[in-house]
């Protein structure tokens, strides 16, 4: 679970880091990053949901010992996921302006969100491939690579956010554009790391990764039958957040800034639960593949208890040290104090 935790942390570090740095730029940048980032994540969750179906199939083949069947799932899933990414990028490059204009009323927030989003969506080309590599390594239970990848992506993102947003280390001062571009480059570095590691360290022949073959639509449909509901679930969970932020945007920049800060804390708190959920998917699939169906319920009970206890500890820290945690995102005293009550509400919800 720990390497998976770090892998999910790295992906969320991109959004959290953007929020933390832009919080020191101003409320408009913070609000625009919230709207643009959520819109990006809404689309990204479709690919993430698809990768969950691939991960379940890969884990099943791994549990059965049918290692040669893993490669076709990986490569066919990657081809379809990348195709989705290219198609969605093309559509959003054309439709981004009228779509964002429809969703946002403030001209100031609109222009900043549009600037952020049209740079950020280039990350689809890399993020949609990265989710498949994560599915592969979680499915075959070689999760240590996720730790290394997480460190690479987080370091690249933090450094470039600092350099590009504020114009440090010889970079031009790009503000909100810098945050978006830094995130894209971090995702590209993650994909490059996965490719180099896979070809350098993994037995390609054993896992059937040494050949792609022709595009197999039947294989893609099998993955989609498993993942379609997960794709919808993840999309709706993010879409609800986006609708909430749309409502707050109509109340004003201050309310939007507070919501983005508190949501960022919520995302970090949710990572242990997500990592345990991902672990459960893989372990259950491996158990079923190896014939250990009887142990599934006991395993799930153990993971659920662990998840709740971890969340109790995280919530307790937030309740005891709210201002210390929120100060990561802003040095404005009034904004910090106004964010504390919302943080308490989120903490209560996390235990549910």
Language-model segments: which ranges?
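Generic alpha-helical transmembrane segments of integral inner-membrane proteins
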Residues: 5, 9, 13, 17, ...
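Small-residue-rich hydrophobic transmembrane alpha-helices
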Residues: 19, 30-90, 127-146, 240, ...
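Transmembrane helical elements of multi-pass membrane transporters/channels
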Residues: 3-15, 119, 153, 186-190, ...
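Short alpha-helical transmembrane segments in multi-pass integral membrane proteins
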Residues: 1, 58-125, 171-228, 284-349
């Amino acid at each position: 679970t720990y390497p998976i935790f770090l892998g999910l942390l790295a992906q969320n570090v991109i959004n959290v880091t953007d929020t933390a740095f832009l919080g020191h730029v101003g409320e408009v940048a913070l609000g625009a990053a919230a709207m643009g980032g959520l819109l990006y994540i809404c689309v990204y969750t479709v690919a993430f949901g698809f990768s969950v179906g691939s991960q379940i199939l890969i884990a099943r083949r791994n549990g059965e010992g049918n290692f040669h069947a893993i490669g076709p799932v990986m490569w066919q899933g990657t081809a379809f996921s990348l195709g989705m990414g290219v198609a969605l990028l093309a559509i959003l490059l054309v439709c981004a302006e009228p779509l964002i204009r429809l969703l946002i009323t403030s001209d100031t927030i609109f222009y900043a969100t549009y600037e952020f989003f049209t740079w950020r969506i280039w990350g689809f080309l890399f993020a949609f491939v990265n989710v498949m590599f994560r599915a592969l390594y979680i499915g075959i239970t070689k999760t240590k690579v996720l730790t290394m990848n997480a460190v690479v992506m987080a370091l690249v993102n933090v450094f470039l956010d600092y350099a590009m947003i504020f114009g440090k280390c010889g970079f031009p001062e790009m503000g909100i554009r810098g945050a978006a571009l830094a995130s894209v480059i971090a995702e590209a570095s993650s994909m490059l790391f996965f490719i180099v590691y896979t070809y350098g360290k993994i037995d390609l022949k054993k896992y059937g990764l040494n050949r792609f073959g022709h595009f197999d639509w039947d294989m893609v449909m099998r993955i989609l039958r498993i993942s379609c509901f997960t794709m919808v679930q993840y999309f709706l969970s993010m879409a609800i957040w986006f609708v909430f932020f749309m409502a707050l945007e109509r109340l004003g920049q201050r309310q939007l800034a507070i919501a983005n800060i508190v949501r960022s804390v919520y995302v970090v708190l949710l990572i242990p639960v997500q990592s345990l959920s991902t672990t459960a998917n893989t372990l259950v699939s491996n158990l079923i593949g190896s014939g250990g169906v009887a142990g599934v319920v006991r395993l799930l009970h153990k993971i659920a208890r662990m998840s709740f206890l971890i969340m109790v500890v995280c919530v307790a820290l937030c309740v005891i040290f709210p201002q210390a945690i929120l100060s990561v995102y802003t040095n404005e005293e009034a904004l910090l104090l106004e964010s504390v009550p919302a943080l308490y509400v989120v903490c209560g919800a996390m235990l549910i």
